Design a protein with these regions (language model features):
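Active-site activation/catalytic loop segments of kinase-like enzymes and analogous catalytic loops
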Residues: 16-60, 76-95
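All-alpha amphipathic helical-bundle segments outside canonical DNA-binding/catalytic cores
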Residues: 62-74
Length: 143
């Protein structure tokens, strides 16, 4: 018998890939298959709730770097996925299944706009401020 395994499933790495991907997906106000970037924004409310539960649930197992880099992990994953959608569009939609012409191009635009939204919130200090406040509350047993 032969078994195919996706290397993402077994490769060593940081939890930041999974956290970034989860937040990229759930905190984006647009769906991945939206037809316009007008609906794209990044919900800091969802971000705060997710990160609070994540840090609290990890019970001190995260390194300082893993906590500090949560905002950047979202940006990295959104950029990576945006580029992958764009490359697949250019290559003729061979990797990601599509239902209509141009769908992967639209998906790329959504992810790259999301990356831009996240970058703005990182640059302004908003996301890191939220993370620091959550960490302070967790350390003080306030959440």
């Amino acid at each position: 018998p032969i078994c195919m395994i996706d290397l993402d499933t077994i490769m060593p790495g940081t939890s930041l890939f999974d956290v970034g991907d989860a937040l990229r997906s759930i905190a984006n106000t647009a769906s991945e298959d939206d037809k316009t970037t007008d609906n794209v924004s990044f919900s800091t409310e969802i971000f705060e709730k997710f990160v609070t539960g994540y840090i609290k649930g990890m019970c001190g197992k995260l390194t300082t770097a893993e906590i500090e880099l949560i905002p950047e992990s979202i940006w990295v994953i959104a950029m990576e996925l945006g580029m992958r959608f764009l490359k697949d569009h250019i290559d003729g939609n061979k990797y990601f299944a599509t239902e209509y012409d141009g769908q992967n191009l639209e998906r790329a635009r959504i992810q790259l706009k999301l990356a831009d939204c996240v970058y703005e919130k990182i640059s302004s200090g908003e996301l890191h401020g939220i993370v620091h406040e959550i960490q302070r509350k967790v350390d003080a047993y306030e959440v």
